[in-house]
From Swiss-Prot:
UniProt cofactor note: Binds 1 Fe(2+) ion per subunit.
Organism whose genome encodes this protein: Ehrlichia ruminantium (strain Welgevonden)
Key words, A-Z: Acyltransferase, Cytoplasm, Iron, Metal-binding, Transferase, tRNA processing
The protein's Enzyme Commission number: 2.3.1.234
Similarity annotation: Belongs to the KAE1 / TsaD family.
PANTHER family: TRNA N6-ADENOSINE THREONYLCARBAMOYLTRANSFERASE, TRNA N6-ADENOSINE THREONYLCARBAMOYLTRANSFERASE, MITOCHONDRIAL
Top EC group: transferase
Cofactor entry: Fe(2+)
Name recorded for this polypeptide: tRNA N6-adenosine threonylcarbamoyltransferase
Length: 348
């Protein structure tokens, strides 16, 4: 086990379209936090992998230097380097891992490869006193899944999306309506002014056992409505956005209820649900989820809204959690575009 003395971790996150660096301390203090969201993708309505990789190359060195300087530390004060090694866009992952390995080699400090989903999952423990085990729902641009979190590095998947991720569907619906990228915040804003009963959208799998998701039918239904609509005015956009959000809310409530029952059948001590990932920043969905969880005698916890999307703080905290268990990596690890959370293998 690693000493209980305060540890300082430099964290690097480049798995998608955010270039992020942070310096985090084991007493839950954030010494610096830099995030650069790449605006280059807006005109394309989604992330273009090659553009993302080039942007990481352009921004990462300066962002790392700025983050270290802002933290008041120098490299000698850093105890370990944590870096997202997957899952994600392989080009961006390679750039972040190369930077982290270079710093580790030069400073002779340990390196910790961090699973991006584990970083989202464990971040809640930086802000709330939550013990293992607990249930987590990860809803983001690339992932949608329920897992039981038994411990750091020990995860059990209960269900996941059979097709699109939830964040991906938000982005695609926004693109159909010419609302821009990212789609989630814009659709949420438009839905506030709309009538959620204007259009009926299919609630896939809602009456089936389990907690898997399917969103492709909703996406197709929205596309058909948009194609057949003669006038795409603001009222229509607000109404379809509200109907879409209402549909997603119904699906989440049903799947969460099932996941709660499944998790308690596995371990009756589980009584908390953590909801994390970019879509967890959606306040309308948070309200639906919170009511559902309370009705099931569970407690729901969310990370701070500004940390639901990708950031270096979550990678740094995951690094600290792993470091406290004595989990470090050799320099020969490779970034992974696919890395299921339940497949993590740790060594001290």
């Amino acid at each position: 086990m690693v000493s209980n003395l305060l540890k300082v971790v430099l964290a690097i996150e480049t798995s998608c379209d955010e270039t992020a660096v942070a310096v985090v301390r084991s007493d839950k203090q954030v010494l610096s936090h830099k995030v650069l969201s790449q605006k280059e993708h807006v005109v394309y309505g989604g992330v273009v992998p090659e553009i993302a990789s080039r942007a990481h190359i352009n921004y990462l060195y300066d962002l790392t230097s700025q983050s270290i300087e802002e933290s008041g530390c120098d490299l000698a004060d850093i105890d370990a380097i944590a870096v997202t090694s997957g899952p994600g866009l392989i080009g961006g992952l390679i750039i972040g891992v190369m930077m982290a390995k270079a710093i580790s080699s030069v400073t002779n400090k340990p390196i910790i490869e961090v699973n991006h989903l584990e970083a989202h999952t464990l971040l809640i423990r930086m802000f709330h006193d939550i013990d293992f085990p607990f249930l987590v729902l990860i809803i983001s641009g690339g992932h949608c899944q329920f897992l039981i979190v038994h411990d750091v590095g020990c995860y059990q998947r209960l269900g996941s999306s059979l097709d699109d991720s939830l964040g991906e569907v938000f982005d695609k619906v926004a693109r159909m309506l010419n609302l821009g990228y990212p789609g989630g915040p814009i659709i949420e804003q438009k839905s506030i002014m709309g009538d959620s009963k204007s259009f009926f959208l299919p609630r896939a799998l809602i009456n089936r056992f389990g907690c898997d998701f399917s969103f492709s039918g909703i996406k197709t239904a929205v596309r058909n409505i948009v194609v057949n609509q003669k006038y795409i005015d603001n009222d229509f956009i607000c109404n379809i956005s509200a109907s879409f959000q209402d549909c997603i809310g119904d699906i989440l409530v049903n799947r969460i209820t099932n996941a709660i029952h499944m998790s308690q059948a596995i371990n009756c001590k589980i009584n908390k649900l953590v909801v994390t990932g970019g879509v967890a920043a959606n306040h309308l969905l948070r309200n639906r989820i919170s009511i559902c969880v309370k009705d099931n005698n569970f407690e729901v916890l969310y990370p701070p809204t500004e940390l639901c999307t990708d950031n270096g703080i979550m990678v740094g905290w995951a690094g600290i959690e792993n470091l406290s268990k004595g989990y470090v990596s050799n320099l020969d690890f490779a970034p992974k575009a696919r890395w299921p959370l339940e497949s993590i293998k740790r060594s001290s």
